[in-house]
């Protein structure tokens, strides 16, 4: 009797037979070795992992969701890691406080011993401590054991739902609000004394504003001098760069500076103040060193220009003009040119003009000759100082180069017509300005006739005339070197070498004739004052009155100085010249358009020596004694020329200070020399 065995259909092979064992995976008939798992049979080749396909017949496996999976794939998909060693747990597992451990990993964090069965476990954060170790722990605060939490806002227990951890407290999400406006804080917040605030309410009550942008500061703040700035708003007012952390900064009012920028600004301010003080009494448009600038002086707290200052008596202008070596200048070319030309018409040479006035004169003379003479050619043959070509036919002007000044000074004299070579060139008559009623000095110059032999011999000796006729019409003497015919040597007193230049014999006659031509009583009075001042002897303000008979050296101006390169100088014996008795008491014709102070103009006569008319020996001093301090020049030696401090340096020290020789220095323009002297603190 056959009994039927109940058959369960294979899901892989629904067709089945009760007499044949079929594979659970592929459904084919199983022959030979088979694997039986839970009453299911498999071919050995068919019993593989459902994920990676590896064979499971010789290794362990897991069955989950009707799938056979190897150990590695099961751990990656469904495995549990140990909370201590972070490895997958297979076999026994210990769960405590929602965490799982290997039995060997569940030990005390302090003594590293396994927990006894049934013992209490103290959990503090990430550490599990046994009861023995928890009692021996020294702590000022009791260890919080995880348990029921209370909201810091409503003080109720947080039983379920999401909690918020802020300010080291737990809150209900709906309880974490701004203390002022009660807005739920879901984003950024600012706390003060453990109380949360929204950003706007915190700034309104406790906020700090930036001094630059006037906005509230959130985050990093830069504090300096009790003021607060955003790090990006605190910038140097000079270089506009931000300050790095810990960098030093200067605070001036509402401005911040880098230390280097502050020092540079102070230096620029001093330089600007210095330039402003020099041009404080000059009108707009004038510039320092310009050839069109005229000396202005301060007398009795009043600013006087050249025109007004020239009308003062010389004694008043000498002793009451304040600091003539530092007074400013202003352009007044119209009056300057007229008065200077009139002074030349009265017989004075440009050696009497100041360095600034001579520059104006030379530029004016150059423009007049260009405009009046169509045959004038501006070529390198002619000197840059405005010296016209020397022709023997020109009886009105010829130029005598200064000893060392680097520029040519016109010397007015009358030449003998018969000693000149005939030529077609006729020099134009210069310096003729029509007279005006407003200025008593505007009188036309007195020109002598060409054929007047007597007047020609008065103004120039025959040797001088013969020497000047040696120059060819296309060659002019070098303005930087003096010709040998202009000086006569002598053996004078052994004390101090003295020298003088011959003056034109007709100058005093011209002055007398101009005196008679003046119809105005004021003009005659002013000219008498000048004649009286010229005929009087001035006292040296730097020498005591009792030493008036001692030998004194006259202070020197820009035109004539002692040679340093050995060029010949004129020496004349006082006892052998009858003209000295007549003119020794008069001040020399020096280069001074204004009546400057005695520091630059007074010349003295000593009966034991010859008269010094524009030449002197400079006493050598160290460079440190000649430096000009900020509080004035009261510390300088008394016998120095304050307008030419560089002349008191030795040749070696002069080269060290200026980087050039004295002759090279004299060839520079006046403004350039003054700038170099300012840089060397000798001005």
UniProtKB/Swiss-Prot annotation:
Membrane keyword on record: no
Entries under SUPFAM superfamilies matching the protein: Glucocorticoid receptor-like (DNA-binding domain), VHP, Villin headpiece domain
Residue positions, PTM Phosphothreonine: 543
Expression sites by tissue: Expressed predominantly in heart and brain.
Annotated Gene Ontology cellular component terms: actin cytoskeleton; cytoplasm; glutamatergic synapse; lamellipodium; stress fiber
Keywords: Acetylation, Cytoplasm, LIM domain, Metal-binding, Methylation, Phosphoprotein, Repeat, Zinc
Modified residue annotations for Phosphoserine: 277, 280, 282, 286, 290, 337, 372-373, 379, 388, 493, 503-504, 567, 576, 607
Protein name: Actin-binding LIM protein 3
Encoding gene (name): ABLIM3
């Amino acid at each position: 009797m056959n009994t039927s065995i109940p058959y369960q259909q294979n899901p892989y092979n629904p067709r089945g037979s009760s007499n044949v064992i079929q594979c659970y995976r592929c459904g084919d008939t199983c022959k030979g070795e088979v694997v039986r798992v839970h009453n299911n049979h498999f071919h050995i080749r068919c019993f593989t992992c459902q994920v990676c396909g590896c064979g499971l017949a010789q290794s362990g496996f897991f069955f989950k969701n009707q799938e056979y999976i190897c150990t590695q794939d099961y751990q990656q998909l469904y495995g549990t890691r140990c909370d201590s060693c972070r490895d997958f747990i297979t076999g026994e597992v210990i769960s405590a406080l929602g965490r799982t451990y290997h039995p060997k990993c569940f030990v005390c964090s302090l003594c590293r011993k396994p927990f006894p069965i049934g013992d209490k476990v103290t959990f503090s954060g990430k550490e599990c401590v046994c009861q023995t170790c928890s009692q021996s722990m020294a702590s000022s605060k009791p260890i919080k054991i995880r348990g029921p939490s209370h909201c810091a806002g409503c003080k109720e227990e947080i039983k379920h739902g999401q909690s918020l951890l802020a300010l080291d407290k737990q809150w209900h999400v709906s309880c974490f609000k701004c203390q002022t406006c009660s807005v739920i804080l879901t984003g950024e917040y600012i706390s003060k004394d453990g109380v949360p605030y929204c950003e706007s309410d915190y700034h309104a009550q406790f906020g700090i504003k930036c001094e630059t942008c006037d906005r509230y500061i959130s985050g990093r703040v830069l504090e300096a001098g009790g003021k607060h700035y955003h790090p990006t708003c605190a910038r140097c007012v000079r270089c506009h760069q931000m300050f790095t952390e810990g960098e030093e900064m200067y605070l001036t009012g509402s401005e911040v500076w880098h230390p280097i920028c502050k020092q540079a600004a102070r230096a620029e301010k001093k330089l600007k103040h210095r330039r402003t003080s020099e041009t404080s009494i000059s009108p707009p448009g004038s510039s320092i060193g310009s050839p069109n600038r005229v000396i202005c002086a301060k007398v009795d707290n009043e600013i006087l220009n050249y025109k007004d200052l020239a009308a003062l008596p010389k004694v008043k202008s000498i002793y009451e003009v304040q600091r003539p070596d530092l007074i400013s200048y202003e352009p007044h070319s119209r009056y300057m040119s007229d008065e200077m030309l009139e002074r030349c018409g009265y017989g004075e040479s440009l050696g009497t003009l100041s360095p600034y006035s001579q520059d104006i004169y030379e530029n004016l003379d150059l423009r007049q000759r260009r405009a009046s003479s169509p045959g004038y050619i501006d070529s390198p043959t002619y000197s840059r100082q405005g010296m016209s070509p020397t022709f023997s036919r020109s009886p009105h002007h010829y130029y005598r180069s200064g000893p060392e000044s680097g520029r040519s000074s016109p010397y007015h004299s009358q030449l003998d017509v018969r000693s000149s070579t005939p030529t077609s060139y006729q020099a134009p008559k210069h310096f003729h300005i029509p007279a005006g009623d407003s200025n008593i000095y505007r009188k036309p110059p007195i020109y002598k006739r060409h054929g007047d032999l007597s007047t020609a011999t008065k103004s120039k000796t025959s040797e001088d005339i013969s020497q000047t006729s040696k120059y060819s019409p296309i060659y002019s003497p070098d303005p930087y070197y003096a010709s040998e015919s202009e000086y006569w040597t002598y053996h004078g007193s052994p004390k101090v070498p003295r020298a003088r230049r011959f003056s034109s014999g007709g100058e005093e006659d011209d002055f007398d004739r101009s005196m008679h031509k003046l119809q105005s009583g004021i003009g005659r009075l002013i000219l008498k004052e000048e004649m009286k001042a010229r005929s009087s002897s001035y006292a040296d303000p730097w020498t005591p009155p009792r030493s008036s008979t001692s030998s004194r050296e006259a202070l020197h101006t820009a035109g004539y100085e002692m040679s340093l390169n050995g060029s010949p100088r004129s020496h004349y014996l006082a006892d052998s010249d009858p003209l000295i008795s007549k003119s020794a008491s008069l001040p020399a014709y020096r280069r001074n358009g204004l009546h400057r102070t005695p520091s630059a103009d007074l010349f003295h006569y000593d009966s034991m020596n010859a008269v010094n008319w524009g030449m002197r020996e400079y006493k050598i001093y160290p460079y440190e004694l000649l430096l000009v301090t900020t509080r004035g020049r009261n510390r300088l030696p008394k016998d120095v020329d304050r307008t030419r401090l560089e002349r008191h340096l030795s040749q070696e020290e002069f080269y060290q200070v200026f980087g050039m020789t004295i002759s090279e220095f004299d060839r520079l323009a006046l403004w350039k020399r003054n700038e170099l002297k300012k840089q060397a603190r000798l001005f």
